[in-house]
């Protein structure tokens, strides 16, 4: 009977491909938009992910997310270091500073100042140079994307004049730029995770970063804390908060707090939610209507099977089998196309992160569409009179 159901399904090629196209479109749009949304929201706490050494981030109690900088006094670092259970506590500067390029243009940059001695808080991966090169005079490390795009230099001829229409030359080791009217020399190129902000990322020492920054009474952005071996991190966080009055959060908790801020105060979830819902509704409409029309066109065949003694349960199994076939094909094609899209977008600025949970949600959505389509068709078949096969 299942072979008969399969032959009925593929017999009408137009409706067969129509059902598959509807399910493929739904699976593609749900998977693609969900993966872009997840990738975009992951970027909101990308800086926390890149800074992997500390267990705890200490900050002003009013900080809402990682880029909401509310500076502390430098004396707070000593207070935190005095708390029992801490292996080390290091300062971190993070702020936007204007860079003056070779052509006279200005570019806002994310400047990160890390501990001068230990270099804790540095970039996750060095492409050129060494992290210790930051100890050189005026040394900075630039992320590779910023070096080849927004901080790139215009090529010049032998007379020193810019060459019109020529491709920009990526910033390289030895090149100089100005940060807040102070000289900085590139001593390394690093690779960092993409963040929600699009500005180039520049690493330097904490002391040098505070000289680049505009003069303020408070310049300490965060305190990075590592717990002693065997120390409960949650308990240490509470101890820091009690002793200092500051907010102390584990890495994951700080990431979640940042993620929740963007979920609550931006329109990103609504925009992507509408796109996913649209894909689901369009897929349901196309697949459901086409599958129902397919069933109507085959009522005489179902009636003949019923006249030959096929039970309603057997007919139900045939319809569910047909729904399973088109569901698996549509799901596979949709997810496959979304995965190819993700591979092509991997080296672009587009965020795309495909998780197994996304595949599960897409599978559940396609299953629901197939079951709904099969149920609508099943009602017609269950009410079918075998005598219809003998009419006109």
Task: Indicate residue ranges for each PLM-predicted region.
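N-terminal Sec/SRP start-transfer signal
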Residues: 1-31, 41, 46-47, 320, ...
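Hydrophobic alpha-helical transmembrane segments
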Residues: 16-20, 336, 356-364
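Hydrophobic, regular-secondary-structure patches
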Residues: 24, 28-110, 128-131, 136, ...
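Peri-transmembrane interface segments
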Residues: 36, 44, 190-193, 236-285, ...
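Basic-flanked hydrophobic alpha-helices used for secretion and membrane insertion
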Residues: 124, 151-249
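Transmembrane alpha-helical interface segments in multi-pass membrane proteins
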Residues: 279, 300-346, 361, 365, ...
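C-terminal membrane-exit region of the final transmembrane helix in multipass inner-membrane proteins
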Residues: 358-392
């Amino acid at each position: 009977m299942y072979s008969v159901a399969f032959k009925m399904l593929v017999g009408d090629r137009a409706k067969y491909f129509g059902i598959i196209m509807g399910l493929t479109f739904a699976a593609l749009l749900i998977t693609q938009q969900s993966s872009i949304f997840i990738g975009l929201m992951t970027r909101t706490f990308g800086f926390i992910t890149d800074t992997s050494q500390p267990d705890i981030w200490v900050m002003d109690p009013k900080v809402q997310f990682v880029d909401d900088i509310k500076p502390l006094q430098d004396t707070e670092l000593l207070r935190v270091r005095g708390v029992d259970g801490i292996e080390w506590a290091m300062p971190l500067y993070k702020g936007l500073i204007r860079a003056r390029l070779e052509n006279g243009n200005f570019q806002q940059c994310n400047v990160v100042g890390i501990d001068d001695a230990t270099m804790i808080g540095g970039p996750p991966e060095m492409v050129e140079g060494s992290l210790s090169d930051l100890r050189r005079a005026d040394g900075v490390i630039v992320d590779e994307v910023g070096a080849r795009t927004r901080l790139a230099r215009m090529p010049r001829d032998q007379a020193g004049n810019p060459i019109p229409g020529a491709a920009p030359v990526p910033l390289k080791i030895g090149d100089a730029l100005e940060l807040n009217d102070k000289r900085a020399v590139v001593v390394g190129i690093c690779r960092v995770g993409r963040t929600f902000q699009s500005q180039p990322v520049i690493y330097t020492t904490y002391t040098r970063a505070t000289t680049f920054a505009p003069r303020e009474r408070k310049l300490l952005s965060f305190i990075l804390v590592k717990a002693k071996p065997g120390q409960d991190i949650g308990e240490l966080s509470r101890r820091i908060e009690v002793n200092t009055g500051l907010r102390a959060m584990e890495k994951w908790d700080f990431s979640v707090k940042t993620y929740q801020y963007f979920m609550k105060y931006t329109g990103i979830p609504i925009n992507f939610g509408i796109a996913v819902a649209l894909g689901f509704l369009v897929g349901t409409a196309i697949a459901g209507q086409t599958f129902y029309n397919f069933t109507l066109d085959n009522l005489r065949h179902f009636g003949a099977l019923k006249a030959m003694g096929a039970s309603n349960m057997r007919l139900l199994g045939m319809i569910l089998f047909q729904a399973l076939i088109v569901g698996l094909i549509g799901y596979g094609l949709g997810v496959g196309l979304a995965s190819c899209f993700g591979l092509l977008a991997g080296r672009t600025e587009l965020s795309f992160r495909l998780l197994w949970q996304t595949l599960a949600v897409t599978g559940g959505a396609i299953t629901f569409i197939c079951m709904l389509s099969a149920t609508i068709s099943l009602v017609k078949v269950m009410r079918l009179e075998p005598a219809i096969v003998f009419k006109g």
